[in-house]
């Protein structure tokens, strides 16, 4: 019974994502195709085979936040930086998704993990997320801890040779997916929101 409830929540999350990204027809595909056949914009995973995500980082309040905080509810995780316009647009779309889900009484925890912890301290993350949604959780930590976690999610990122005069930094390029984590702390799916590349 609980599995059916979780599956319904996942379906509604997918529909919300589709509404925001303008790919409504995927909802119809989702209702008629098995997860293994659904290949457009989403990758699924067998939850029984998926390992639990493990990490320990620091949130925007300067407190320890580890992988146990992902258990007990669904979570959406996104990796990025506070100075990227692209990441800002993505998080605002995630905020729109959360609003839709709240109307369906589905509570989803949103976790934003910086890929540039040397710049994005707890204080920087707090000020940044207050402008988007202060219910979002922002995580930073040691460079090696961020790299290990990014590796668990198969996040690809590197610092390019393009210098951004607005941020006075070299651009950090990275893969752009939103990850859905189960209430057991396991990877379920990842989504591409299809935003234009703006930096």
From Swiss-Prot:
Q: Which domain of life is it from?
A: Bacteria
Recorded hits in SUPFAM superfamilies, A to Z, give:
Thioredoxin-like (SSF52833)
* CDD domains, per database record: SCO (cd02968)
One Pfam family assigned to this protein is SCO1-SenC
Annotated InterPro entries? SCO1/SenC, Thioredoxin-like_sf
By sequence similarity, the record places it as follows: Belongs to the SCO1/2 family.
Q: What is this protein called?
A: SCO2-like protein RC0042
The species this protein was found in? Rickettsia conorii (strain ATCC VR-613 / Malish 7)
Q: What is the lineage of its organism?
A: Bacteria, Pseudomonadati, Pseudomonadota, Alphaproteobacteria, Rickettsiales
């Amino acid at each position: 019974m609980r599995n059916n409830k979780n599956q319904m929540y996942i379906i509604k999350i997918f529909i919300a994502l589709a509404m925001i990204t303008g790919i409504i027809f995927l909802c119809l595909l989702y209702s008629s195709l098995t997860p293994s056949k659904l290949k457009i914009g989403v990758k699924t995973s067998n939850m029984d085979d998926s390992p639990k995500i493990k990490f320990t980082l620091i949130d925007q309040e300067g407190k320890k936040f580890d992988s146990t905080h992902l258990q007990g509810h669904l979570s959406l995780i996104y990796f990025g930086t506070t100075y990227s316009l692209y990441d800002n647009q993505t998080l605002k779309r995630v905020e729109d998704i959360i609003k839709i889900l709240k109307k369906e009484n589905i509570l989803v925890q949103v976790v934003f993990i910086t890929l540039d912890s040397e710049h994005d301290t707890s204080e920087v993350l707090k000020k940044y997320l207050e402008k988007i949604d202060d219910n979002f959780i922002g995580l930073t930590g040691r460079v090696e801890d961020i790299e290990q976690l990014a590796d668990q999610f198969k996040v690809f990122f590197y610092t390019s040779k393009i210098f951004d005069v607005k941020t006075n930094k070299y651009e950090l390029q990275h893969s752009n997916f939103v990850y859905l984590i189960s209430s057991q702390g396991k990877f379920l799916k990842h989504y591409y929101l299809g935003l234009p590349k703006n930096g």
